[in-house]
Amino acid sequence: MMFSGFARSIAKTLCVLSLGGWMMACSDDYKWDNENPSYLNSSIYDCLKEKGNYTNFIRLIDDLNYADVLAKTGSKTLFVADDDAFKTFYASNNWGVGSYEQLSTSQKKLILNSAMVNNAYLLEMMSSTVGPEPGLCLRRETAADVLDSVPHFNGDQLPTNYNPDDFDYWARFRVPSKGGIYMALDNSNQMMTHFLAQQMANKKITDKDFSIIVGQERSKNDAFIYDSKVLEQNITCQNGYVNRLDKVLITPQNMAEMMRTNGKTDIFSHMMDRFSAPFYDAELTARYRLLYGNSVDSVWQKRYFNSQDYRPLQNDQGTDPTGNPNGNTIKFGLTFDPGWNAYQANSAVTKEQDMGVIFAPTDERLYEYFFSEKGGGRFLLEAYAPEEMANVKGLEDKENIYRAVDQIPRDVIQALINNLMKEQFCNSVPSKFETIKDDAQDPMLDETHLDKIQKVLLANNGAIYLMDEVLTPAQYAAVSAPAYVSKDMRVMNYAIQKLTWMGTAKNFYAYLLAMSSRFSLFVPRDGFWYIDPVSFIPKNNNVTPRAIYYDWNEKTDAMRGTSYPITYDFQTGTYTIGDTPMSTGAASSTELSDRLNDILETHTIVHEDKTDVSGIDETATGVECDQHYFLSKNGAPVYVKNAKQHASGMEVQGGWGLQHDESQKVVRFDDKTRETNGNGNGMAYQIDGAIVPTIESVYSALYNNQDKFGKFFELCEADNSEILETLKPYLNKDAEGKDIYTNAEYLKRYAIFVNGGGLPCFDKQTGTIVTQATNVRFFSNYRYTVYVPSDAAIQTAIEAGLPTWQSINSYLELDKEPEQRTEMTEAEEEARNVKAAAMVTALMNFLKYHFQDNSVFADVPALAPTQYETATLNSETGIYCKVTVSSSGNGTLNVKDTAGNTRSVLDNFKNQLVRDYVIASNQISASSFAVMHGIDGVLNYKTLTNGRYDSDWNTTGAAKRFIKNYQIKD
């Protein structure tokens, strides 16, 4: 017999046994060489004939010329249905077939080939992949071939697209004279999905999962092929195995076709089909013509544009081989191709190990989503299809529903579809719902969604959960959604979605998708001005300020930034923007992106719960609360007034606006909060211009207010280099006498202001540049508060022994010529220098103590006493010295120092907004924002002994101890 080798191999598996250390071996004249064991049936074909109740299946085998294969050769695994199962099938099936005689050849092939695996497998081994790797196999190939069924589609059966801006790939085939199209629904072969105990255990698919997905209960060792139960397992034949099913196995179609034909997901299927196209398949055409003759000119396959890593389709080459042979790049796409029979999630997971999942909303739910007053997708139709939406008469008015939904651009509607497509079935069973993430990587489902599952459809390449809920993507629920769909906020949408900054994709859209955050997003309409701070840096000794006009170029469909010159009057703070774009000195594309990044972060406020400090939980109120000042993502203060009036009077200002009496009005308001919509993360406000931050630095604010704060500015700004050189052995030596820092680093540590790439300080009376050394040395890309004591307060401190650079200079006699200085012994000079070093240490720590981490404003709400760190470090403890800030509300602010002194902010200098820029290669590489307040007294980082500063160095020993405790280390 031709299959005797297979039979012999089965018998010989019992030949060698090892049990309890005993081995039984086979001789060469083993009896099963000439005689079959009793459990071994004849061939698969003969076995079925002998049993007598498989006449329908035998007819399939005979009609398709498979009798010799299944009677004389091997090896096969067959899943068969008996005549009783066929009787039930004829009574009710989707094909409308009432008897065997009514089956077409294609249908016969589908039944037989889909039930046949081209190898002999024990059922329990079918859960193993090649290796073998037990418990990994969910699906496997069968004898089915794509040519078993290549249907013909008439024009009215093909996808339609009502969006005039979309290229309709199907249009030419819908023309009646064309006569339709012969099309494979995919050019890969259908696979068999089986639920076997070992694979389910390995992938932690529970019996409850199975019952929800398949709609049946299972016992421990049950095996199912799709929803067909194996009633009789592993009937062993001489050329393979037969398994009897409880019903006729009809391999289901792929997910795309199943959604198109099940009658409950027509709208969702239509939405997905907008991403499909017919692709000419030369190989399939040749095979078809070889098999069926030359009556068919061409065979096409239906594919879906997708961005899957493993098998992406992002070019339409092949849709028009003659007219456009090279095709075009496609900018939209689904998560994966739902029509791909041989679906594979990625290179690490084979097609046998997993399949896809779609959480498809029913027609009823999608209709509510788009057309009900509170539907989560209504804003899309309001933006793109207001007229078409008005024409829809109800759920049954499918054509007008399609017409309306199709107006939503594909690169917008894909967010909804892709959120509902998950790449791995084994990780998406009901028991794992809480691990499934949405497009923001937040939890998308929980156990309550089990009640939302209307039914599960098993396709040949995945599972479809029919959902009584539309799981809206974060992209639609987030504050960025209005910009995402609006036609007049495209510049900001570009910044959110596609901006590249410093050579790296910003991916700000992902940040704004966080549903656990609460945002207020301000979005200027296209056509807004931005005062470019970098343009105030002199080039070739000239300053040419410019404003950038951001708008959307309709011709190129791209963001555009045009530079215009500014005429600026520093004395009055007024300016005019020129009418003609700059021919030289215009911002480059890199600079445009850089400033757009600054705009993006300035317009985004991330709210926090500040109940403990101000009594306001901003995560609940957003900006609609009893305060005016808020900090944006990059630390820029934003002033908000009339917040609850929305588009009827709400205004916002940045530092530039406050200093130039300009404001941006809210022209549209979108509530995207979770409280209102069930999912969301804040409020979106469209404004009529950009919020522009200040260009004034801490240095500039002090320099140009010397009439009030000249003494503090003088202490911060004075040249102390000669003093530091003299005291270097006392301030920059370790215990072994080695330098702690390089000379440059040492000198920098005793400076308040440095040249760190910041904007120059302009004298507001003359307009001339004072200096470019304007950056606070210890600011570090954060937000701060600077307290500025009045001249009277500084003078009182000086009278109490606070050293000044001038007094230290005089104490060291550096203001005298060398020959005029007092002669001292080495010990006397040592003692003097130690005391002078203590004075320097005291003065530096005094100044730094007025620079506080975190920005605190004199605003409407009262503030509970709250401690904040300053820039002064107790080097002995390693702890930064703190101040305690409080307010009784209504614009007041009090600061209490370590010594217990409470100072109040001055009404004539409070809430002054400043910013220290760090500019590199004409880009804003970093910046620090601060708010400045004048105060009516100085702040002391320690309690004064006898009310005097100089008590800390009245002896050499005291001076040394003081230096040790407060040495300047950063």
Model-derived regions, located:
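Sec-dependent bacterial lipoprotein signal peptides
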Residues: 1-26
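Mature, structured domains of secreted/extracytosolic soluble proteins
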Residues: 25-970
